[in-house]
């Protein structure tokens, strides 16, 4: 990793986590970068569910997957990540990826919100199998970013440490509230 982007940092952990045949979720589809990564890692025997509420994100992701000749192992859902539990069984998902904030190049008014993000994270814990991982990139920019960041971090802090390992990192010397990477591992 030489570009020092939080998403690249998180993708290293995702690459170590996801195996051929896994079920994975991209909870915030965006422009499809994580969907493509998950699709390539879980291969033709795996499955990726990708969520976004914007048609623009779904179209951009479909184009990215088609251009990359991604395996036909994904379902793109024009749906809130707060409804992900309707699409997978409990204890069945190995990796769930969240990039909070707004769609790059999109309408900044259409950003993730603390309330629905915490709902989605609650569902993610139920869907995650033992040993599974959630990768979060928390961007505090935008109109609701600080509020969402604070809600998510407060929610993560109260998780039972016997059931979940929560690892939070941060840029220590960067100004302007850079994104915060967090990993959650389901222990039991």
Predicted regions and their residues:
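Conserved beta-strand signature within the Rossmann-like core of class I S-adenosyl-L-methionine
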Residues: 28, 127, 131-138
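Conserved SAM-binding motif I beta-strand of class I
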Residues: 47-52
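S-adenosyl-L-methionine
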Residues: 1-22, 36, 40, 58-91
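Conserved SAM-binding loop of SAM-dependent methyltransferases across substrates and taxa
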Residues: 31-45
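Class I S-adenosyl-L-methionine
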Residues: 146-188
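Mobile active-site "lid"/loop adjacent to the S-adenosyl-L-methionine
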Residues: 98-120
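Helix-to-beta-strand junctions that scaffold the AdoMet/dcAdoMet cofactor pocket
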Residues: 19, 42-43, 128-130
């Amino acid at each position: 990793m030489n570009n020092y982007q939080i998403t690249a940092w998180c993708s290293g952990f995702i690459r170590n986590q996801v195996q051929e045949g896994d079920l994975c979720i991209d909870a915030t589809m965006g422009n499809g970068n994580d969907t493509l990564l998950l699709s390539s890692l879980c291969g033709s025997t795996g499955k990726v569910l990708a969520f976004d509420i914007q048609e623009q994100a779904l179209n951009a992701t479909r184009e990215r997957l088609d251009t990359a000749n991604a395996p036909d192992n994904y379902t793109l859902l024009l749906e809130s990540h707060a409804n992900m539990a309707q699409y997978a069984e409990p204890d069945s998902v190995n990796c769930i990826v969240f990039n909070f904030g707004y769609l790059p190049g999109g309408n900044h008014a259409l950003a993730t919100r603390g309330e629905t993000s915490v709902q989605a994270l609650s569902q993610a814990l139920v869907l995650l199998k033992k040993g599974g991982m959630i990768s979060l990139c928390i961007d505090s920019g935008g109109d609701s970013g600080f509020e969402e960041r604070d809600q998510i971090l407060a929610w993560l802090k109260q998780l039972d440490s016997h059931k979940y390992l929560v690892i939070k990192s941060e840029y220590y010397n960067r100004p302007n509230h850079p994104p915060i990477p967090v990993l959650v591992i389901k222990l039991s």
